Swiss-Prot record:
Transcription factor that specifically regulates the neosartoricin B biosynthesis gene cluster. Signal peptide: none annotated. This is C6 finger domain transcription factor nscR. It holds the Pfam family Zn_clus.
Length: 711
């Protein structure tokens, strides 16, 4: 039989390149092809025998393996060396695949296939149900108004990704330590030993079961509040991370756990405690004329909307539903916790109303009738099992500052929001009662003993100055023809001196090292600042204004730099007022140092702006005492006593190796002026008219009506 000759080997054809085949476009089969050259990508040519077609392709499909990725075997008659040729062809394919992978790694362009895959994934995610998205999305968007934390979103599933901060034992313990150091002394709504046993020692919290939703929400709120009280340096030292990252992580965990615990439906006060801690930092700006200027605990700089102001109404309603004002039926421990929580809500309600400004949700009558302060004791004096009554302590305790704050909100409501309190006699009587209750708490207080004692010592003095300022310049706008008159010019304290004393105390906290732990808690209150500016505007004593203006200017700059979520009406009013005061005082106080006025509200250019005797002192240039009034004459306490009055009846000398003096303004309503030689140079009607215009501008800012310095 005649031997058949070898069959000619099938030639490798130049087929469409990889990219053109994927894009399904016609390829000119050049090397490189025109399409790849114009696209600026690497062209991967394809050279192989053509795949069988027709009857041959059908037969191959029937005989192909189940694995779709398996190579297709081409059944072609071949000579004895066909296996070697097939191996060579396979090696070439492998080399082409390797080249293709290398080119994909080196190329910055995304192939069509990758883009289509991404589009498919994105379109698939967009079709997921909204409830599933709530579980995957860790943040509360501004459009929800913060209602998600109330449990109104319809999803109660926890976000394990963001709640993991509670599972990180080391981070949660450090944040708890920060809370006990920076927050607990000034926001006293929790029992310190119980928190320590729970978060630092791993014991159960007040008998709650493990992983109870209320306890988890409280733990997350503690971490969140502690994170906001950190400085950037402290954040790096403790966590090796920026403060913003720690705050963002803690906030998401707090919102997640609050949503799970549902404050609207929870029957325990622990959830409300967590909710209040979340809200404390949230209200837009602390604007307290009795300058609390405190409790910036959670979202002030992050959420400048009115969401938290609205959520405050939920907290008040929840507190009433839990019967917090009465607190009956509990043991001694439960009664103390309820009283602390209710008065903290009243305080936040008062501060929030001043920051808008608006009427408080809790009326004066309701706040007065339900005012039952907790005991003046330390947390170590009682525990959850205490059933007997614990008497008050003398001297500084864990609750001293909070008790003063509760008295501040009670007096502030009477002086600012009670229409019936109009005559000078009743207003002075309210201030005197407030002073008697608060200054009594300073007895035996050594301001040099601890930073907390130092902070409490100076803040209480600041509160008393603020109460007197509220008696003279209430926040309530007077529409009648008979406004409240100021105190007698021969016996009354100086309005400007009171305002400057408050601003100086704020600077003291921000400059003295002993106030570092509480600086997050204290900002410049806008009411004393506005009063000081308006008094400088109408004051005729140029020498007095020259001494007072650097303090006012420094306070205004600090207010603008630190308060980013202030009310629009308040910000506009302060800007306009400052611009007008600068414009008026510029000719009389013009020196080499120029202060630039606001370009938005000032009608004149920078050439007409105010110049002051010297640049307002920076924080680094102020001495450790932080006393911006240190170069002025101060009157001693004995000089301010009335005839026959004993100094011991007014205050006790603190137990200290370096005795401290209470500010002279705090001894009596007819005390001498803060600035030596100062006289009352402003007529009562003109002084009141200046403040009345400031208050009216807050309510009538959109009307554009003319006034003495805001037009």
């Amino acid at each position: 039989m005649e031997k058949r000759g070898p069959k000619r080997r099938q030639q490798a054809a130049h087929l469409s390149c990889e990219l053109c085949r994927e894009r399904k476009v016609k390829c000119d089969k050049l090397d490189p092809c025109t399409n790849c050259s114009s696209a600026g990508v690497i062209c991967v040519p394809v050279r192989r025998p053509r795949l069988p077609r027709g009857a041959h392709a059908q037969r191959l499909r029937r005989n192909s393996p189940e694995d779709p990725e398996a190579p297709i075997q081409i059944d072609i008659a071949s000579p004895a060396d066909a296996g070697t040729i097939a191996d060579d062809d396979l090696k070439k394919r492998i080399r082409r695949l390797e080249a293709l992978v290398d080119s994909m790694r080196s190329s910055s362009h995304i192939s069509k296939q990758d883009q289509e895959a991404e589009d498919t994934i994105e379109s698939t995610l967009n079709r997921i149900d909204d409830d599933s998205l709530l579980i995957k999305t860790p943040r509360v968007h501004p459009s929800d108004g913060g209602l998600r934390i109330l449990g109104l979103s319809g999803s109660s599933s926890p976000e394990t990704g963001w709640a993991s901060i509670l599972e990180d034992r080391e981070i949660s313990m450090q944040l708890c330590q920060v809370y006990l150091l920076n927050v607990d002394p000034v926001i006293k709504i929790l029992h310190r030993p119980s928190v320590e046993k729970w978060m630092l020692q791993g014991q159960r919290y007040l008998g709650f079961p493990e992983r109870h939703s209320a306890v988890e929400s409280l733990g997350a709120a503690i971490c969140y509040v502690a994170a906001t009280s950190l400085t950037e340096t402290q954040s790096w030292a403790r966590f090796h991370a920026t403060k913003s990252s720690i705050v963002a992580r803690a906030r998401r965990a707090c919102e997640t756990t609050l949503e799970k615990s549902s404050p609207l439906l929870s029957p325990v006060i622990t959830t409300l405690q967590a909710f209040l801690l979340y809200l404390h930092e949230s209200f837009i700006e602390q604007n307290v004329l009795i300058p609390l200027k405190t409790h910036q605990v959670a979202r002030r700089s992050e959420d400048p909307s009115r969401a938290v102001w609205t959520l405050m109404a939920f907290a008040v309603r929840i507190a009433k539903a839990l019967d917090l004002p009465r607190g009956a039926g509990d043991n001694f421990f439960g009664q103390q916790m309820r009283k602390r929580l209710w008065l903290a809500i009243c305080l936040l309600d008062f501060q929030t109303s001043l920051s808008q400004p608006s009427e408080p949700l809790i009326t004066v009558a309701e706040a007065t009738s339900s005012f039952s302060p907790p005991k003046h004791i330390n947390d170590s004096d009682f525990d959850p099992t205490t059933s007997h009554d614990v008497p008050d302590r003398e001297g500084l305790t864990d609750t001293t500052f909070s008790l003063v704050s509760y008295h501040v909100q009670a007096a502030g409501r009477l002086l600012n929001f009670e229409p019936s309190v109009k005559d000078d006699g009743s207003r002075q009587q309210n201030v005197q009662h407030f002073e008697q209750r608060t200054l009594r708490l300073l007895l035996y207080c050594d301001p040099e003993s601890t930073p907390y004692a130092w902070f409490t010592w100076h803040r209480i003095q600041c509160f008393v100055s603020g109460a007197r300022l509220s008696a003279i310049r209430p926040l309530m706008h007077q529409h009648g023809d008979h406004p409240i008159s100021i105190l007698d010019t021969n016996e009354g304290t100086s309005i400007l001196s009171l305002a400057l004393n408050i601003l100086e105390k704020v600077q003291l906290v921000h400059t003295d090292p002993r106030g570092e732990a509480f600086r997050w808690f204290v900002t410049v209150p806008w009411q004393p600042l506005a009063i000081a500016m308006s008094e400088c505007y109408i004051c005729q004593d140029i020498a007095l204004v020259q001494r007072a203006w650097p303090i006012v200017e420094a306070a205004f700059q600090q207010h603008e730099a630190t308060v980013s979520g202030s009310s629009k009406a308040i910000s506009i009013t302060l800007e306009r007022l400052m611009c007008r005061v600068r414009e008026k005082l510029s000719p009389s106080l013009g020196t080499s140092t120029s202060l630039t006025a606001s370009p938005i509200f000032c009608a004149t250019n920078t050439a007409n702006t105010l110049s002051v005797p010297h640049t307002p002192p920076s924080r680094s240039s102020i001495t450790s005492s932080g006393d911006l009034l240190g170069n002025w004459s101060w009157t001693t306490a004995t000089e301010l006593l009335r005839p026959g009055e004993d100094l011991a009846l007014v205050t006790e000398a603190p137990i200290s190796t370096s005795p401290q003096k209470i500010d002279p303004l705090l001894f009596s309503l007819d005390s001498q002026l803060l600035i030596a030689g100062q006289e009352q140079l402003v007529e009562a009607d003109q002084s009141w008219a200046a403040w009345d215009e400031v208050i009216a501008s807050l309510h009538d800012d959109e009307t554009g009506r003319a006034n003495m310095f805001l037009s």
